[in-house]
């Protein structure tokens, strides 16, 4: 994905395309149903978003069941994570979504899920700070990867309720010119993104499979 420099939050009064919002809401709702059916969004965990334009994103309202979303469960925020035209409360982790949109110009959908596999992997690999994925055919799902003879590291960042601190940790990884297709948060889950919702869903499915393989290998070797 193309990395850009961070941009400041825009005025929340700027207009956005209502038709684009409606289309994004439907894509987010469909993703929630699909991922919920796969067991990736237990309870009211997880959060999803899509870019509306350079200044706004559509994001899930905090505390909603992601497998049973309606258009009323999708709201608009600016790139500073502030609600636009709504008294609803966006996900507490909205800044992680807007950070991705600011840093990756071609990211148009962000998914964060909490599967058992993702959560266990985040705990197991937290001391190392990353999960190393080598030699998997499925790595070719990520843009720019054309062979199984490749290696990517999935960083595992310490969990915190202070989102600016977590944003800075992610940004430090990007500034170090390390490839980034997604990241884990210790004891929490995974963030990944795509040029559209379909690609973001493929990335979630790929990470779920690859992390499961790494956990199985650990068990078999023990």
Task: Identify the residue ranges that each predicted region occupies.
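Glycine-rich flexible loops
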Residues: 2-222
């Amino acid at each position: 994905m193309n990395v850009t420099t961070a941009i400041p939050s825009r005025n929340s009064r700027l207009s956005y395309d209502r038709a684009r919002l409606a289309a994004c809401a439907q894509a987010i709702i469909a993703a929630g149903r699909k991922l919920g059916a796969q067991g990736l969004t237990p309870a009211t965990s997880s959060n999803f978003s899509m870019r509306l334009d350079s200044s706004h994103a559509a994001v899930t309202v905090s505390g909603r069941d992601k497998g049973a979303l309606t258009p009323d469960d999708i709201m608009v925020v600016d790139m500073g994570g502030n609600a636009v035209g709504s008294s609803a409360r966006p996900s507490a982790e909205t800044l992680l979504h807007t950070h991705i949109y600011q840093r990756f110009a071609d990211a148009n959908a962000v998914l964060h899920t909490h599967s058992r596999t993702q959560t266990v992997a985040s705990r197991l690999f937290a001391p190392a700070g990353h999960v190393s994925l080598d030699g998997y055919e499925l790595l070719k799902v990520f843009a720019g990867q054309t062979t199984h003879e490749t290696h990517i590291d999935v960083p595992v960042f310490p969990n915190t309720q202070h989102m600016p601190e977590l944003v800075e940790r992610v940004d430090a990884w990007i500034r170090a010119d390390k490839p980034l297709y997604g990241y884990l948060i210790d004891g929490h889950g995974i963030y990944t993104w795509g040029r559209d919702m379909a690609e973001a869903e493929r990335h979630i499915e790929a990470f779920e499979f690859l992390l499961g393989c790494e956990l199985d290998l650990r068990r078999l070797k023990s």
